[in-house]
Every structure is written in C-alpha cells, then in structure tokens.
C-alpha cells in the first residue's frame, strides 16, 4: 500500500508542469518568482505574461520614482514595504548595474490650507523612520530655484530608477520559465491538487499553486479561479507631458496630496534619462488598458458600471473627478496645475508623452482600497491591489507572497 501511494505521488509529480504558476510578468509577478526561487531553490516556477515582453503596463508606464514611504499610514503594508523596498531597490540596482539615482524630493505647499497637511506628512515621515527636513519659503530655492511655495519638506531617500530593467533582471535571476504571449483564458482548480491554466494559444499549464499578479486584470483572474475577490479594478489613466525646458527642474517636486485619495497629484520628475516628466493626473479610463480617450472596450466599461462600488465612488468624489477630467481635456487647465509649483512653465513647454493606467481596487461600498491587498484562496494567492508604490515595494511584496505560496506547498 505504501509503495502504491508513493507511485501515485510520482505520477502526480510528472503531471505538473511546475510547482508555482505565476500569472503576470510585471515587476510584482517577477519579484514573486525571484523570491520563491531564492527562498526555496529547486522550486519550479512558470510565469505567464500575455504581452511579448515584461513590464509592459503599470511597471513600465509610471514616473520611475523610488518612493520613500512618507505618504503611507504607519504600520500599513505600503509604509512597511515602501520604506524597506526603497533601500532594497537601490541596493538591487547598484548590484546589477541598473540605472538609478537617489535624488531626494520636495513636497511643496502652495496654499495655506495645505500647511496642516504638510505638517502631518512630517509627523508621518518621522513615524515611518524617514528623515525629513522642513523648509520655509525662502529655503525652497536651495533645492529648486524655479519652484515657488509657502513651505516645503525635503525627503532625502527618494530616488529614480529604470523599473523595466529591474523587471528584466528579476526575470533572469529568478531562473523561472517565462512564457510571453501567454494570455490566460481559463483557470480550472481541483481541490487539493492544484490548477490547470489554458492560454490563448491552446496550451495548458498545470501547477500546484497559482499566484495572481495580473495587475489590471487581477480581479478577473481571481473570479476565473473561483474566488470572490470582494473588489473590482477600476482603471484610472495617468497622463504625462515631457517638459520642453528640463533645466527648470533639478530633481523631484510634488504637491501636497489630498489624503482622501490614493493619488499624489501632478508632479515634476527628473528621470534617469535626464528628461523631466510632468504628471500624472487621474481620470477614469474607458478600458483597462485605455491609454487614451480613443481606447474604449464596451465589455470592460460594462463591468465597471455593473459594480455598485463604482457608482458610490463617483457620487462621493464627483467634484475631484471633474477637475481631473478638465485637466485631461484642457492643456491650459493642466498647465495651470503645474504653474502652482513652477510659475515659469508655459503651455508650449509641455510636450505630450506616454500615459499609464493605474489598477485601483474599489470595494462594493465605493471605498478606494488604500493599502496593498493580498488574499488567499484554495491553492491560490491573489495580489488584488498593488498600484504605487508597488514598484518601489516589489521586493518585499514578492517575499510576502512567496511566504504564503511556500506555506501552501509545504502544507
């Protein structure tokens, strides 16, 4: 009997293509693969990515900022993972020769109503263990001669890097099998046995545990697996311009964010290429990969509108949303927002650049999920909310997911 059960187990091993099947080849999925193989060498990991290369969406379409962690509620996953992740990301980039720079950044109050919020950020930074220097108006010019404000804080641990290069390096170092052009169409799960995933090219990949790092489609993958995610992804497009006179900005300049929203406002970022990116705003997208107003996917719009939380969110935040749409359709309005920080800028200085889409989880009651959200199902781990600062925090996120996965494998 013992011999027979061992034989059955061997057959089962042969039937699996991998131990862990990761859906999503962005920086979080690849960091998870990297963390699994580092923690448990010999674990067979396969990553399925529907695009022809890694990091084609959220990872590769953002400001490229290594965030300090100053914005996030002390004790939250975002605070813990961003603070830790920023240090680790700089070390990872240095180890593998990936372009990066620790530049520091300014957060600038331009109106009196923002001063209490700026002071609250100072306190939050201290609680999160982040060194912060408070500046009066005259001191802002020490860092940014062209920027104007009533007061500011300087955060020295913020930086910039090439997150796409980081993702590629993670893929290489993980030793995982990466299958590009592998769009997932169906997930079949059998209790206690694992999952079988069918891709658009007709392939079937079997694994013991599924990891859902599908970003903009993570809620759909969760439902395919048979798990209720309890949220829905509402896509928000972030539009950028390139500053035609990059000499106006030395480093990174941010406004004081509204704590009611998980968006940081239109900011100025000198990237590793020396160019200065201006943006993003945050407007509802008409497709999950809706990088412009002309991209409309009726099925995805219908999915968003059928979610009660989308309507509740809209009723609660219509005024904020209206301002964001105005800045999207009017370059003059966008320029006006930038001029609050950088008075010298003109409409002619702003050159349209590539946009991004943020995968924002919204609960049924209309709450915008403000922290990273990771949930487990039977033989599955789902990353259901990982927008900014997930790229910064990707190494700690990957380890957190890996711990759960290895717990399932060892159970």
For each feature predicted by the language model, list its residue ranges.
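Dinucleotide-binding Rossmann-like beta1-alpha1 core, especially the glycine-rich loop
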Residues: 64-139, 149, 265-267, 275, ...
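Glycine-rich FAD pyrophosphate-binding loop
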Residues: 37-61
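C-terminal catalytic lobe of FAD-dependent flavoproteins
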Residues: 263, 293, 311-411
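Beta1/beta-strand and adjacent pyrophosphate-binding region of the FAD-binding site
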Residues: 12-28, 46
